[in-house]
Every structure is written in structure tokens, then in C-alpha cells.
A protein has these predicted regions:
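Active-site microenvironments that recognize anionic phosphate/pyrophosphate groups
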Residues: 1-115, 123-187, 195-245
Length: 245
């Protein structure tokens, strides 16, 4: 599976890493176009710079706070963002227009992202199966916590390594109207927040400045995988060999 990056479409794309101090397009909400849905300051819209061919690239602006993040949001705000994001992701999946739909978040200079303003990306792949290289073993491992049908594992067979934490909940709880499922969805959001805070503030002495957060539907579960990001190991780049520590 190979995605095609169109360099012409990337021309003029803002980049806080290479060109810091520029105007943030996500702060100027009055100028945003192609908005699909909004809920307060949470906005789902079509990505202006759709650089991948045969895809539909969309953005979820999480908050009006330019420097906000999962690690710093108040608990209720983080829960609301997760519910909104899951509903947007599932709407694209239910449309049936895509072979697969991916949702993920970049944070920090080593994450692969270009803008500081907090956002997630929801990308529909028209022809490719984004899960083709994944296996259930990538999401299992050492159990470290469980409550209210939510559990947390540390991968013993990571996708990339070195350290990948999985937060696992029953699929569909965020869309359910039942009080039990609502409690589970909140627990899911809270667990993700705890893991992200750990990755940024405690893991490796708090030296991580970047992370990725990936979402998957796997075998009746929704999984959030948190990865601290460092310079990528040559073992993975050249040989696809993951490492653990």
C-alpha cells in the first residue's frame, strides 16, 4: 500500500515548524470554509490542503485555545472533544464512500504535524485498506489498568516502538444513549488523557516533546494508541523492525 503525496497541492501550506510565527488558520474561524459540522468551538471541516491523492482529508479543530492539548484540557472538555471526534470519524465510515477511514492526532515537532493549533485528522482512503499491515497483537500486551469496560495495555509487539500504550473500549459506546455506555465513553476519554500526560510529563523523565494518537476499530473494540515520538530508528526505517523498551 502506497499513498501518493501531491507536492503541488502542498504549496503555501502553513508550517509552524519551518515558518514559526505565521498566522494560524485555525484561530481565524471566520475565514474557514467547507465546514461540515461544529459544536461550540469544535469544528469539523474539509482540509484546505488535500495533499494525498484518492483521499478525503478532513480536520477536527479541537478548541479555540491555540496552545491547548489533551494533556491540558479540563476533564469535561476533553470528554466532549473525544465524543465529537468519534462521531465525525464514524460518520465518514458509515457513508460507505471509502475503503477505510483513519483518525489520528499529531502533537509536537517530531510528530509529523505542521500546525501547533490542536486538531485531529480524519482521512478517508478511497482505495486503500489502512489496516492492511495491522494485526490484533499490535494492540495487546501487558495489562496495566482496567475499569468500566476500559482497559490499558502496553504493546509487547508494537507497530513501530519503542513504547506504545493502548486504551481499549467497546466499539460504539460514544454513540450510545445508555448511561452505562456514556460512563464507559467518559472513562475512555479520561484514560487517554492520563496516558498522554504520562507520556509528556513522566515517560523518560518527561523528555518527550511529541506524540501521536491513533484510533482504530478492531474486533468489536475502539482502540486509542498513544506513541511518544522521537527520531525514528534506522532499524524501523530500513528494515521495518520494531523495538521495545
Amino acid at each position: 500500500m502506497t499513498l501518493v503525496f501531491d507536492t503541488k497541492r502542498a504549496q503555501g501550506k502553513p508550517d509552524d515548524n519551518r515558518r514559526p510565527g505565521g498566522c494560524c488558520p485555525f484561530c481565524d474561524t471566520a475565514a474557514l470554509g467547507n465546514i461540515i459540522r461544529r459544536d461550540g468551538d469544535r469544528i469539523w471541516l474539509v482540509n484546505k490542503f488535500r495533499t494525498l491523492r484518492d483521499t478525503m482529508q478532513t480536520i477536527i479543530i479541537e478548541s479555540s485555545d491555540h496552545h491547548g492539548d489533551i494533556s491540558t484540557y479540563p476533564r469535561e472538555q476533553n470528554r466532549g472533544i473525544l465524543r465529537f471526534a468519534l462521531s465525525c470519524w464514524n460518520e465518514m465510515i458509515r457513508s460507505g464512500d471509502y475503503a477505510s477511514v483513519l483518525m489520528y492526532k499529531n502533537f509536537g515537532p517530531l510528530s509529523g504535524g505542521s500546525l501547533v493549533h490542536p486538531h485531529l485528522q480524519v482521512v478517508g482512503l478511497k482505495h486503500e485498506d489502512g489496516y492492511a499491515a495491522l494485526a490484533p497483537a499490535h494492540f495487546e500486551g501487558i495489562g496495566v489498568w482496567a475499569a468500566d469496560r476500559v482497559r490499558v495495555t502496553i504493546s509487547t509487539e508494537p507497530i513501530m516502538g519503542f513504547f506504545e500504550v493502548n486504551v481499549i473500549a467497546p466499539e460504539g459506546v460514544a454513540a450510545s444513549g445508555s448511561p452505562v455506555d456514556a460512563c464507559t465513553a467518559d472513562r475512555f476519554a479520561d484514560a487517554i488523557q492520563v496516558v498522554v500526560r504520562y507520556v509528556l510529563n513522566e515517560h523518560h523523565g518527561g523528555r518527550a516533546t511529541s506524540y501521536n494518537l491513533f484510533f482504530y476499530h478492531m474486533d468489536g473494540s475502539t482502540v486509542a494508541k498513544v506513541m511518544p515520538r522521537w527520531v525514528v530508528s534506522p532499524y524501523f526505517v530500513g528494515y521495518r523492525l520494531a523495538q521495545i523498551n
